[in-house]
């Protein structure tokens, strides 16, 4: 259920930009306040395994998240500008597709 390769995810950092971190993979989803039983993390800079910069494990926060294209109740997204980015070289590795 991981999106892209292990530890391979690139998302612009920001106060409303978080990722699910129940494991070390970049999942196909964006964590926002909801009832999804996963930990969310404030996103720190992450890099592909072949990057010269060490992978930074995000800090875990409250157990809530919202997975895109899931059956979980969606949170109120009114007024939130959300943009996601797929790191070059990871597009074809997503399963399921984002």
From Swiss-Prot:
It holds the Pfam family Keratin_matx. The modification N-acetylalanine is found at residue 2. Residues 3-59 are annotated as: 4 X 5 AA repeats of C-C-X(3). One of its GO terms (molecular function) is structural molecule activity. GO terms for cellular component: cytosol; keratin filament. Sequence repeats lie at residues 3-7, 8-12, 47-51, 55-59. Wool. Keywords: Acetylation, Keratin, Repeat. In the wool cortex, wool keratin intermediate filaments are embedded in an interfilamentous matrix, consisting of hair keratin-associated proteins (KRTAP), which are essential for the formation of a rigid and resistant wool shaft through their extensive disulfide bond cross-linking with abundant cysteine residues of wool keratins. The matrix proteins include the high-sulfur and high-glycine-tyrosine keratins. Belongs to the KRTAP type 3 family. Interacts with wool keratins. This is Keratin-associated protein 3-1.
């Amino acid at each position: 259920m991981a999106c892209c390769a292990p530890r391979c995810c690139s998302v612009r950092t920001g106060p409303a930009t978080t990722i699910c971190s129940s494991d070390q993979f970049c999942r196909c989803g964006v964590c926002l306040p909801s009832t999804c039983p996963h930990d969310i993390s404030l996103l720190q800079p992450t890099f592909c395994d072949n990057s010269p910069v060490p992978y930074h494990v995000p800090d875990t926060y409250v157990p809530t998240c919202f997975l895109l294209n899931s059956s979980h109740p969606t949170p109120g997204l009114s007024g939130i500008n959300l943009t996601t980015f797929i790191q070059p070289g990871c597009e074809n590795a997503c399963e399921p597709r984002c």
